[in-house]
Amino acid sequence: MRNDKRLPDAELEVMQTIWSLGTQATAAEVQQHADKDWKMTSVLTFLSRLCDKGFLSCTKEGRQNLYTPLVSEEDYRQRESVGFLRRLCGGSVKNLVASLSDAGALTDRDIDELRAFLDRQTH
């Protein structure tokens, strides 16, 4: 499913928790495995919003709901990366890398990994 909505941080954390749990999760599992100390009412609100936005489906399984991702983690990451690049750097990867370098955010190891990655892409 193609979903162009950008998620707020809390909803993204819920999605990351579900993605890390596998193919589906209950609200209790999300609450237990999330890195936040959320109340169940907050978790249920986030899950409901994610269903409304088309990121999750909800099916009744006995007495509980099972939430299944409709958007993969990789698809979301790729879309957000491209959007970030367009919004902040005018679509220029060079500008992004230059900004990171100027800010001192790139280590020698990062640069070596980038070179190796680019070498693999061109060969």
Language model features with spans:
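Short, cationic-aromatic polyanion-contact patches
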Residues: 4-10, 61-80
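Pre-recognition alpha-helix immediately N-terminal to the DNA-recognition helix
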Residues: 12-17, 29, 95
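Short acidic, hydrophobic short linear motifs in intrinsically disordered regions
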Residues: 24-34
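Short helix-capping/hinge SLiMs at alpha-helix to coil transitions
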Residues: 18-23, 103
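Glycine-centered, phosphate/nucleic-acid-interacting loop/turn motifs that mediate DNA/RNA or nucleotide
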Residues: 54
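Amphipathic alpha-helical dimerization/coiled-coil segments
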Residues: 80-123
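Short, hydrophobic-biased segments on the C-terminal half of alpha helices
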Residues: 44-48
